[in-house]
Curated annotation (Swiss-Prot):
Record family assignment: Belongs to the cyclic nucleotide phosphodiesterase family. PDE4 subfamily.
Gene: Pde4a
MF terms (GO), sorted A to Z: 3',5'-cyclic-AMP phosphodiesterase activity; 3',5'-cyclic-GMP phosphodiesterase activity; cAMP binding; metal ion binding; TPR domain binding
Domain spans labelled PDEase: 343-672
List of catalytic residues: H419 (proton donor)
Residues at which Mn(2+) binds: D460
Biological role: Hydrolyzes the second messenger 3',5'-cyclic AMP (cAMP), which is a key regulator of many important physiological processes.
Originating organism: Rattus norvegicus
Gene3D superfamilies named in the record: 3'5'-cyclic nucleotide phosphodiesterase, catalytic domain
Positions bound to Zn(2+) 2: D460
Protein name, entry field: 3',5'-cyclic-AMP phosphodiesterase 4A
Pathway linked to the protein: Purine metabolism; 3',5'-cyclic AMP degradation; AMP from 3',5'-cyclic AMP: step 1/1
EC id: 3.1.4.53
Region feature (Disordered): 1-124, 296-317, 668-690, 818-844
Segments of skewed composition (Low complexity): 36-46
Length: 844
């Protein structure tokens, strides 16, 4: 593991709003706000108009959330707490009512006549408990102190957020819930000091006379209690004064969480170069920063690389058209015998065996894709719709359903390593399991379930394999069309709904107008929530809602309005989209290989255009293990622990798997030795880094050319100018096949092919020094697009940098080869090269 580096001016610092002029810094919350009496939360079930005809089994066909690799143990085991601990690999040590509202008719079945959502006979779908039952539970960074300068003698040590089972306490961290808890405390203290009993018919559960009589308290104790009550009321007023009329209460939590994450990332970025890059990746991806993005002006040399080919310019389409749509003709008889799982396959028995785990967490979607002939999305979508009886409930013709599924899957790019139909199928199946959570049984209507499943299926359709920021920085037509706001998410929605207009593809043709409008609104809200820059806002919204109910007396989460219901659904799809780290390790590692391959392909495009390479997109410097540990610690764990609070205890096994996977990647970091001295900034062969905010860890273009210049090799510019002649000779990275191919083999092959193509002496190649540390994980090489193979729907994007950067990539591979020549092929640190991405996103 890399030794901690001294803090520098290059550390991460987000521009978050500070106190207004003349306003003092907010005081820390009173100490007791971190521990509140535990209040169970119940999510009220909706009623069924046909409840007399539906048995309990029919209403809940998927009651338990099971893991695909779990063993049947009979009765549900006792509640266990997550073993997740605060990350210690980067810095420091571990730390731990109102009246009921009737649902509108277009939103699915209405409550039964005479049965109110508040009816006492409605059994709860959820009971939430925070804290531990058998062991201490350490939480995410959200439960750490919000202030580094909290030195008040009244403040307790907040380094540990362990809830005490003996005292039955909940931990409250969202500001609005803390304000409510504070007001309740003030009310209780007032009752005690004045001997005025609290009416039992009011909201507070502390009805009746105070538990302690004022006469039993000394004068000094009463005065101290009065002072503390006044201080608490002042704190509460100060919190309310900072609120702005146009901001929701959950924005208080969002602002707080962003501030805390900023502090954690700053610490992480100061520890090592790789930590700096991980910090920037998390900041750029998961924080919706409103500050302007400064794009440096390209040099004349770089500008030549950014000119799109003339053939691309001629293909420009009017802005009014939705790009990426293809005219497809699906042959075969859709009106005759319908396949059992919606797709034709000669391995139906094996497919049926895999689909026995359809309603379990951890289904091996890779095996499903293999047995379904690469049609994993169509197979999963059809099977789920059949199992939930949605085709009959909404009168969806089977042939229309099959036509839409096939058309939708064909609009996912098979040559994109991660965001392909395989990922869509995985998110769809995960959403299906989360909808079947026992805590949410009988909560959502059939139309809401249909909307959630449809949103999961289309949420990444026509994804080009690059990020929103890449599209914005390159002035793509999509970014212009959607004004730089959730560019890809808006495009996915447009394509998903546009495909419904294709011949015999409208699966919602028999819905009423109001049902279609309601479904469309829900789908739009859920897909837009998959924009990762909205992550902290979604997390703050959900946590505020959960904790607000914890500090209220009722503890009943009614979900009786659209805002609350869609909030849960949005977070559900978001959780499914970020569920890879919660799956069995063998599946998680495959997803990690794929996302890194996609990142590196984007990095190659950025390098070709002379752009700054995005964090984690440089295949020469990215740290896969550290990125995954940081991803879990700062993004995935806080989200899933909040979801686990909502559906407690149903997500306990998911949290356990998440921790196991995090430990595996963390142990891989420990096995990696520190980079050699000459690799550190300011070391041998490297100039000192500039004193400015800069996360980029790759060598500058000019420095690379100077240090890697080898006689007999053309320069990058010369290669580009002679591109037409060189393409036939350049190394074709798409020919590097086989998931078992090691980088050593790839490097040896590249050495031979490049020497043949450019006449470079082999001796001069091996004379180049090695800058890779022996323990650095070898990252997967990716398939690159040919010059005529552009990302559909993204006009003006040239091919990747394989042909242009072949000499430099060869040198990097040669250096990796000499550094790792003694590495065994069984070493877990070696990540196999994924090779070409075949049908359905599977490796060919």
């Amino acid at each position: 593991m890399e030794p901690p580096a001294a803090p520098s001016e290059r550390s991460l610092s987000l521009s978050l709003p500070g106190p207004r002029e003349g306003q003092a810094t907010l005081k820390p919350p009173p100490q007791h706000l971190w521990r509140q009496p535990r209040t169970p939360i119940r999510i009220q079930q909706r009623g069924y108009p046909d409840s007399a005809e539906r048995s309990e089994t029919e209403r809940s066909p998927h009651r338990p959330i099971e893991r695909a690799d779990a063993v049947d143990t009979g009765d549900r085991p006792g509640l266990r707490t997550t073993r997740m601990s605060w990350p210690s690999s980067f810095h420091g040590t571990g730390t731990g009512g109102g009246s009921s509202r009737r649902l509108e008719a277009e939103n699915g079945p209405t409550p039964s006549p005479g049965r109110s959502p508040l009816d006492s006979q409605a059994s709860p779908g959820l009971v939430l408990h925070a804290g531990a039952t058998t062991s201490q539970r350490r939480e995410s960074f959200l439960y750490r102190s919000d202030s580094d300068y909290d030195m008040s003698p009244k403040a307790v040590s907040r380094s540990s957020s362990v809830a005490s089972e003996a005292h039955a306490e909940d931990l409250i961290v969202t500001p609005f819930a803390q304000v409510l808890a504070s007001l309740r405390s003030v009310r209780s203290n007032f009752s005690l000091l004045t001997n005025v009993p609290i009416p039992s018919n009011k909201r507070s559960p502390l009805g009746g006379p105070p538990s302690v009589c004022k006469a039993t308290l000394s004068e000094e104790t009463c005065q101290q209690l009065a002072r503390e009550t006044l201080e608490e009321l002042d704190w509460c007023l100060e919190q309310l004064e900072t609120m702005q009329t146009y901001r929701s209460v959950s924005e208080m939590a969002s602002h707080k969480f962003k501030r805390m994450l900023n502090r954690e990332l700053t610490h992480l970025s100061e520890m090592s170069r790789s930590g700096n890059q991980v910090s920037e990746y998390i900041s750029n991806t998961f924080l919706d920063k409103q500050n302007e993005v400064e794009i440096p002006s390209p040099t004349p040399r770089q500008r030549a690389f950014q000119q799109p080919p003339p053939s691309v310019l001629r293909q420009s389409q009017p802005m009014s058209q939705i790009t990426g749509l293809k005219k497809l003709v699906h042959t075969g008889s859709l009106n005759t015998n319908v396949p059992r799982f919606g797709v034709k396959t000669d391995q139906e028995d094996l497919l049926a065996q895999e689909l026995e785990n359809l309603s379990k967490w951890g289904l091996n979607i890779f095996c499903v894709s293999e047995y379904a002939g690469g049609r994993s999305l169509s197979c999963i979508m059809y099977t789920i719709f059949q199992e939930r009886d949605l085709l009959k409930k909404f009168h969806i013709p089977v042939d229309t359903m099959m036509m839409y599924m096939l058309t939708l899957e064909d609009h996912y790019h098979a040559d994109v390593a991660y965001h392909n139909s395989l990922h869509a199928a995985d998110v769809l199946q995960s959403t299906h399991v989360l909808l079947a959570t026992p805590a949410l049984d009988a909560v959502f209507t059939d139309l809401e379930i249909l909307a959630a499943l449809f949103a999961a299926a289309i949420h990444d359709v026509d994804h080009p394999g690059v990020s929103n920021q890449f599209l914005i920085n390159t002035n793509s037509e999509l970014a212009l069309m959607y004004n730089d706001e959730s560019v890809l998410e808006n495009h996915h929605l447009a394509v998903g709904f546009k495909l419904l207009q294709e011949e015999n593809c409208d699966i919602f043709q028999n819905l009423s107008k109001r049902q279609r409008q309601s479904l469309r609104k829900m789908v739009i809200d859920m897909v837009l929530a998959t924009d990762m820059s909205k992550h902290m806002t979604l997390l703050a919204d959900l946590k505020t809602m959960v904790e607000t109910k914890k500090v209220t007396s009722s503890g009943v989460l009614l979900l009786d309005n659209y805002s609350d219901r869609i909030q849960v659904l949005r977070n559900m799809v978001h959780c499914a989209d970020l569920s890879n780290p919660t799956k069995p390790l063998e599946l998680y590692r495959q997803w990690t290989d794929r996302i890194m391959a996609e990142f590196f392909q984007q990095g190659d495009r950025e390098r070709e255009r002379g752009m700054e390479i995005s964090p984690m997109c440089d295949k020469h410097t990215a740290s896969v293990e550290k990125s995954q540990v940081g991803f879990i610690d700062y993004i995935v764990h806080p989200l899933w622990e909040t979801w686990a609070d909502l559906v407690h205890p149903d997500a306990q096994d998911i949290l356990d798997t998440l921790e196991d996977n995090r430990d595996w990647y963390h142990s891989a970091i420990r096995q990696s030795p520190s980079p050699p001295l000459e690799e550190e900034p300011g070391g041998l062969g490297h100039p000192s880094l500039p004193d400015k905010f800069q996360f980029e860890l790759t060598l500058e273009e000019e420095e690379e050319e100077d240090s890697l210049e080898v006689p007999g090799l053309p320069t990058t510019e010369e290669t580009f100018l002679a591109a037409e002649d060189a393409r036939a000779q350049a190394v074709d990275w798409s020919k590097v096949k086989g998931p078992s191919t090691t980088v050593v083999e790839v490097a040896e092959r590249l050495k031979q092919e490049t020497a043949s193509a450019y006449g470079a002496p082999q001796e001069s190649m091996e004379a180049v020094g090695c800058s890779f540390s022996p323990g650095t994980p070898i990252l997967p090489d990716v398939r690159t697009l040919s010059s005529s193979e552009e990302a559909p729907g993204l006009l003006g994007l040239p091919s990747t940098a394989a042909e242009v950067e072949a000499p430099r990539d060869h040198l990097a591979a040669t250096r990796a080869c000499s550094a790792c020549s003694g590495t065994s092929g069984d070493n877990s640190a070696i990540i196999s090269a994924p090779g070409r991405w075949g049908s359905g996103g599977d490796p060919a």
